[in-house]
Regions:
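SIR2/sirtuin-family catalytic core signature
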Residues: 57-181
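Extended, H/D-rich, highly charged conserved domains that either
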Residues: 1-53
């Protein structure tokens, strides 16, 4: 699922059954048209609890993070105005000292020197990778197999072949061939 943690103008939700999808779709259970999701705007105090769709998205993300071996943070600055969201993520990830094998991957345009301090509540010692763009990230270098390759490199000492990764000059057709072949 794609989870829209701050709502989405293209998403709809069935309050009765907890189902969601595009706003033009119908609930697969009751067949009624989805209601539009609410949006959370960039304000100091966001309410992640009162709207059922947003609350359920955050619960799903928390569970996924809790069970994850690796997290990729893509262009998220964790602003002080989003303290509630950062706290929810920290709670889900837990103590980084108990995540001794897990890896954090950050894709951002900020300087690499800022990463360890900015994400200190998630990074165990040096267990992170920094990329300025998607193509040099684990996701871009090892599509469909990023966690598997990170585990092989760091836990099994197997050198990874990143020649099958995505490149900036690839067309949609190239991407499709790369993924499915």
């Amino acid at each position: 699922h794609i989870l829209c943690l701050h709502g989405n103008v293209a998403m709809g939700y069935c309050e009765e059954h907890g189902e969601f999808g595009t706003k033009t779709a119908n609930c697969p259970i009751c067949m009624r048209k989805f209601s539009p999701t609410k949006l959370l705007y960039p304000v100091a105090q966001k309410d992640y609890e009162s709207d059922a769709y947003i609350h359920n998205c955050w619960k799903a993300v928390q569970q996924a993070i809790d069970e994850s071996y690796m997290i990729t943070i893509f262009g998220y600055s964790a602003p002080s105005s989003d303290r509630s969201a950062v706290d929810l993520l920290k709670h889900a990830w837990g103590d980084p000292q108990k995540r001794q094998l897990e890896e954090i991957s950050v894709i951002d345009i900020i300087d690499e020197e800022e990463i360890p301090m900015k994400w200190k509540d998630f990074i165990h010692t040096h267990h992170y990778q920094y990329s300025k763009d998607f193509y040099s990230s684990y996701l871009g270098l090892f599509p469909r197999r990023s966690c598997e390759m990170v585990f092989a490199m760091f836990c099994l000492n197997v050198w990874a072949d990143n020649t099958k990764g995505f490149r900036k000059d690839m067309s949609w057709s190239d991407l499709e061939n790369q993924i499915y072949n």
